[in-house]
């Protein structure tokens, strides 16, 4: 074996091993994350907000100030929004919606966590980040969020009676001072939350402000990187290093998106430096799976010396957001992430209060007495779930990338263009549900536009709507494969083509294993078009077992068994995932196993007929698809020889586009002419051309394979179209 072949095999083995590890880790992550609502709901108070501890006492406030723990409530909101479980149907928010609770926290509540003053850097950063998530996830529009006015009664000039937009802009002007609580130094934790939220909420800041923040973040990163690398226990603060790296990367992403801020990237450490910093953070992970405490964010003014620290899961969530792929691709760091998951498994607390209400979740360890009593914290539990959700998302992103690479596809090289779809010759589907329409119109209106709208609005995480699967049937040569490619380009999604060889290449004895393997890969894809091509051999009924190609009934029984016992359930699972659009093409609709058309497999059964003669003979088709010289003159001559609605045109309606091209070149050769136009000019009488069509039609590819005359094929074709229409949810 050549060194190149050995290298490829080694890469394949490494990729397969990484895929297997990631799938296993994702299973554990989803198992832990599945109880988000059950863990957080017991902390919900009657007003819809969330208390910090099971036994949190009601705080004394003036009548017009609601008793809301803003930091805890917003952190729960962040976890719910990140996971997509913020709607009332998820039963985490029932008496009030997530948007109502957020507005109440922003407008009426005191932004003074743990005795801190209203509008302190810690609480403000959490509120602003929650606002950004609200906008980014489509929960609230940016203008509405920015216009929310903090109307708390206290006369704090920083926040009182100012809109959220004004608060963000006024605080950001102060640069790093905006991220300091009282007399404590500025913290990169507060800075990352604040900046991420401001960007997400669409609050514009001047370039000078960004330069201040970028300069401070770079200095903080380099300072902490030196301390951590030197193992200076007295000065190092790994959480601050992690958050500084995340802050810088967030600013870098902004500078890549906003042309007027492009110069910011020159002020920032390189991506390689940032990744070195992240590696250094993980070197300080304890054996338990999380990090020891270093410097506090602040001390509670009324807490008897108690302090608040950046919880490990808060900076881990930020690391995954900004450097997820880097972490998961690195075997050493991937093992560290697994250690974190083990901590989640072994450190979950359970507590039952005096009323019998049960609480499950995690504690940050900040409340020592509560930890000793086994009481979890709402915000810490929410932070763990934010980490789990982000880990799931980053694993899924990387699996999508790795699986596509296995198919020889790089998503970054995929471009979005509707040109190929627009250039496709349309086909009449007037019998479709008895409504006059066309093939392209049905596909564009029912599938492509809906999927594209969801992608544009960032709502694709909720899943693709019905219809998202199509069975394409029709004679060979009707551009079913080209249609799949055009659909993928229209959306800007990769096209993954699956043929029978993917399942049968290793022999019949390995068919089920191959089906399992390929569909595991397909289940890891998102925003992709999957095209099952040439699947007729795997979809035949017993009535179609005896074929003229010489295959025995036993062979076809095996392929039929493959479909019914392996592929069909997998198609249903792929449909349930709601992450891809998948198509299957067949030339033999009548021979399909009826099970394939059942609900939750194919939402829509569409005939892909030969386009009408007028479309096939158009200059656009002759030039763009068939590449015939002098297309306009050829179109004009064909219009004279086979005018619309003539008997000859009706015959030519049954020809595929490819067959029209073959026929025209057949005429050129038969008449010994140099061009198609010269060949057509040999026909002065339309009846002579009609006879040439009839003589050639008996050998046409489509008709020969169907074993039918033009008239018989057209009759059966029209009848079959009446039976199929778009599926409905």
Predicted regions and their residues:
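C-terminal engagement/docking regions of AAA+ P-loop ATPases
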Residues: 457-462, 678-729
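An alpha-helical repeat/solenoid feature that recognizes helix-turn-helix modules
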Residues: 2-27, 31, 56-89, 112-143, ...
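Conserved AAA+ ATPase small/helical "lid" subdomain
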Residues: 630-697, 704
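Walker A/P-loop NTP-binding motif of AAA+ ATPase domains
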Residues: 436-636
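Dynamic helix-loop-helix/coil hinge segments at AAA+ ATPase domain boundaries and subdomain interfaces
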Residues: 420-445
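Surface-exposed intrinsically disordered loops and tails
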Residues: 288, 292-302, 346-369, 643, ...
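Long, well-ordered core segments of solenoidal/helical folds
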Residues: 22, 26-54, 91-114, 144-178, ...
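A short, basic N-terminal segment
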Residues: 384, 398-429
């Amino acid at each position: 074996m050549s060194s190149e072949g050995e290298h490829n095999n080694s890469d394949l083995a490494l990729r397969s091993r990484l895929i297997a590890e990631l799938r296993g880790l994702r299973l554990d992550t989803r198992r832990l994350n599945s109880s988000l609502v059950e863990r957080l709901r017991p902390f919900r108070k009657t007003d819809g907000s969330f208390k910090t501890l099971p036994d949190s006492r009601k705080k004394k406030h003036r009548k017009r100030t609601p008793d809301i723990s803003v930091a805890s409530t917003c952190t729960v909101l962040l976890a719910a929004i990140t996971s997509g479980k913020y709607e009332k149907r998820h039963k985490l928010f029932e008496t009030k919606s997530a948007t109502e609770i957020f507005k109440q926290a922003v407008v009426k509540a005191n932004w003074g966590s743990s005795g801190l003053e209203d509008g302190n850097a810690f609480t403000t950063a959490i509120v602003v980040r929650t606002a950004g998530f609200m906008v980014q996830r489509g929960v609230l529009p940016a203008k509405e969020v920015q216009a929310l006015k903090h109307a708390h009664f206290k006369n704090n000039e920083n926040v009182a009676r100012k809109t959220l937009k004004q608060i963000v802009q006024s605080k950001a002007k102060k640069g790093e001072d905006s991220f300091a609580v009282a007399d404590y130094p500025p913290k990169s934790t507060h800075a990352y939350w604040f900046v991420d939220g401001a960007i997400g909420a669409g609050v514009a800041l001047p370039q000078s402000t960004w330069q201040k923040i970028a300069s401070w973040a770079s200095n903080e990163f380099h300072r902490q990187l030196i301390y951590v690398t030197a193992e200076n226990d007295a000065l190092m603060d790994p959480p601050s290093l992690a958050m500084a790296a995340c802050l810088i990367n967030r600013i870098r992403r902004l500078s890549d998106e906003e042309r007027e801020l492009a110069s910011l990237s020159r002020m920032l450490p390189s991506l390689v430096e940032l990744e070195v910093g992240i590696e250094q953070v993980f070197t300080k992970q304890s054996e338990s799976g999380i990090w020891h405490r270093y410097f506090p964010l602040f001390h509670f003014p009324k807490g008897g010396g108690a302090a608040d620290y950046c919880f490990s899961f808060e900076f881990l969530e930020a690391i995954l957001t900004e450097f997820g792929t880097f972490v998961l691709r690195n075997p050493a760091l991937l093992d560290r992430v697994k250690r974190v998951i083990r901590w989640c498994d072994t450190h979950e607390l359970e507590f039952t209060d005096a009323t019998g209400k049960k609480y499950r979740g995690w504690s940050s360890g900040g409340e020592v007495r509560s930890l000793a009593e086994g009481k979890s914290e709402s915000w810490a539990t929410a932070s763990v779930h934010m980490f789990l959700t982000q880990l799931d998302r980053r694993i899924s992103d990387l699996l999508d990338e790795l699986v596509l690479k296995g198919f020889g596809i790089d998503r970054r090289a995929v471009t979005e263009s509707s040109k190929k779809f627009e250039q496709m010759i349309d086909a009449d589907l007037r019998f479709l549900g008895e409504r006059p329409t066309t093939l392209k119109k049905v596909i564009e209106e029912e599938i492509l536009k809906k999927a594209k709208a969801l992608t544009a609005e960032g709502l694709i995480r909720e899943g693709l709507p019905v219809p998202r699967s199509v069975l394409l049937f029709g004679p060979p040569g009707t551009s079913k494969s080209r249609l799949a490619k055009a659909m993928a380009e229209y959306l800007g999604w990769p096209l993954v083509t699956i043929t029978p060889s993917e399942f049968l290449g290793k022999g019949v004895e390995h068919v089920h294993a191959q089906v399992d393997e390929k569909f595991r890969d397909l289940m890891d894809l998102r925003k992709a078009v999957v095209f099952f091509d040439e699947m007729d051999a795997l979809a035949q009924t017993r009535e179609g077992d005896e074929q003229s190609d010489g295959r025995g009934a036993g062979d076809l029984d095996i392929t039929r068994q493959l479909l019914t016992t392996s592929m069909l359930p997998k198609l249903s699972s792929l449909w349930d995932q709601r992450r891809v659009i998948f198509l299957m093409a067949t030339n033999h609709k009548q021979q399909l196993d009826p099970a394939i058309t059942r609900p939750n497999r194919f939402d829509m059964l569409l005939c892909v007929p030969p386009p009408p003669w007028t479309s096939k003979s158009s200059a656009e088709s002759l030039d763009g698809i068939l590449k015939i010289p002098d297309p306009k003159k050829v179109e004009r001559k064909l219009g004279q020889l086979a005018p619309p609605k003539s008997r000859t045109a009706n015959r030519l309606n049954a020809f595929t586009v490819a067959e029209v091209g073959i026929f025209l070149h057949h005429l050129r050769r038969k008449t010994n002419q140099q061009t198609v136009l010269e060949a057509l000019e040999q026909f002065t009488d339309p009846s002579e051309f009609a006879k040439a069509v009839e003589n050639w039609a008996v050998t046409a590819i489509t008709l020969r394979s169907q074993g039918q005359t033009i008239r018989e094929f057209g009759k059966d074709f029209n009848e079959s179209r009446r039976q199929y229409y778009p599926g409905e949810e």
